[in-house]
Amino acid sequence: MSQSTSVLRRNGFTFKQFFVAHDRCAMKVGTDGILLGAWAPVAGVKRCLDIGAGSGLLALMLAQRTSDSVIIDAVELESEAAAQAQENINQSPWAERINVHTADIQQWITQQTVRFDLIISNPPYYQQGVECATPQREQARYTTTLDHPSLLTCAAECITEEGFFCVVLPEQIGNGFTELALSMGWHLRLRTDVAENEARLPHRVLLAFSPQAGECFSDRLVIRGPDQNYSEAYTALTQAFYLFM
């Protein structure tokens, strides 16, 4: 079913079990984040970390997908976004399980003793270029605040041996990110190439890395079928979240 009906209200996005206000966040709720939150492997996880939490979307999606015993830490550098994430989480069914931290992840990590089974991030990927309208949007879009080597290092410092570190990136940038991760000792375990329809080349890639070596499973996801409605595969992946699916 095509999500033609608007699910925007009060400058946010309504899902089946929660609402995400994002009017004070530089980066809004979008398909990339929804894909990542629905795709990341959660079987057996006990502790999750969301790096660059923004509006809290990924933390909320993980909370919906996991048991009541799972604790989620959401770290966001920008204070307005972190405050809005906290408000979104407070209004959700999982407020007691999600901890929002207004902090620089590189500093926050050094103070942690716990390790995470699942680390998730929808990271910046633009190199410095065209000036953004606000410093907050520039921070969210560009890798100047947290570049990819630093992101991979942060994840490596706090992941369990069998844990997964999951990201979503544009296809070509994802290929470069994979090369970098492999050179730093990570192992690629899951890869899903995402295309808008069968006729188009993949434009996004979902990646799951682990410190532990193992077989890499790869597949392809097409978002829309020939009729321009959501494909069966995309519907199966996201229907627990989309309000009109």
Curated annotation (Swiss-Prot):
- Organism listed in the record: Shigella flexneri
GO BP of this protein? methylation; tRNA processing
- Region forming the signal peptide: none
- Kindly give the Pfam families that the UniProt entry links to this protein: MTS (PF05175)
Per the entry, what this protein does is:
Specifically methylates the adenine in position 37 of tRNA(1)(Val) (anticodon cmo5UAC).
Q: Which UniProt keywords apply?
A: Cytoplasm, Methyltransferase, S-adenosyl-L-methionine, Transferase, tRNA processing
Supply the InterPro entries for this chain.
DNA_methylase_N6_adenine_CS, SAM-dependent_MTases_sf, Small_mtfrase_dom, tRNA_Adenine-N(6)_MTase, tRNA_adenine-N6_MeTrfase
The disulfide bridges present are none
Tell me where it mainly resides: cytoplasm
Main EC class the enzyme belongs to? transferase
Q: Which family does it belong to?
A: Belongs to the methyltransferase superfamily. tRNA (adenine-N(6)-)-methyltransferase family.
**EC number(s) recorded for this UniProt protein:** 2.1.1.223
- Reactions performed catalytically: adenosine(37) in tRNA1(Val) + S-adenosyl-L-methionine = N(6)-methyladenosine(37) in tRNA1(Val) + S-adenosyl-L-homocysteine + H(+)
Name assigned to this protein? tRNA1(Val) (adenine(37)-N6)-methyltransferase
PANTHER family noted in UniProt: TRNA1(VAL) (ADENINE(37)-N6)-METHYLTRANSFERASE
Q: Name one GO cellular component term.
A: cytoplasm
Localization, per the record, is:
Cytoplasm
Q: Name one GO molecular function term.
A: tRNA (adenine-N6)-methyltransferase activity
